[in-house]
Amino acid sequence: MNVCWSLKGGSGTTVVAAGLALAAARRGIRPLLIDLAGDLPAVLGVEGAGPGVTDWCSAADGPGPEALEQLAIEVPGGTRLVALGTSGWHDAEAERVAALAGHLVQSDGPLVIDVGNLGTTSVPEALLGPLVERATRSILVTRACYLSLRKLPAQVRRPTEVALVVEPGRALGRTDVEAVVGSPV
């Protein structure tokens, strides 16, 4: 399970998650891409206004978490996307959120999950915590930007690795980011 997250909006988390899923598909792996941030349909050029993760979490008497794959949209390039959905996280049933977290953490299939910005996400902690903490790859997506990195010391969660979005003209580099984060770039 690959979980992509950031500490600042606009860091590129959605693009990195999409890239990971599409790269896996090119290698013959058919990952399930799960959008908890809401931007993946637009990035991938597919319709995402239908039911998704939040709708499943809000359906009190709905089917089990294995049915989530039935909500997947085929994406050109060989991956499948479960969109965020049309319900808000505030409508989610606590038991369904916990069941989803358990299902995803125990899944044997290839997963790429876009959590988005941890600082502003409305994803329930009962889902967010297990995903970030138990991910095979917990990937902090950041730019070599002081504003992005200054939030890290206050963050309880630590990534297993960093996806550094490189931009010309930045004063910070790879070694600076590794030193601050304490994880490989």
Language-model-derived ranges and their functions:
Residues 84-87, 138-139:
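Short, basic, glycine/proline-bearing loop/turn elements
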Residues 87-93, 119-124:
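Glycine-rich, Arg-bearing micro-motifs that act as flexible, cationic patches
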Residues 99-106, 110-185:
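Conserved catalytic-core segment of NTP-binding enzymes
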Residues 67-69, 75-85, 92-102, 115:
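Flexible loop/N-cap segments at domain edges
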Residues 27-28, 49, 53-59, 87, ...:
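Cytoplasmic membrane-interface segments at the C-terminal ends of transmembrane helices
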Residues 27-80:
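Phosphate-binding loop that captures ATP/GTP phosphates
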Residues 2-37, 104:
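Walker A/P-loop phosphate-binding motif and the immediately C-terminal alpha-helix
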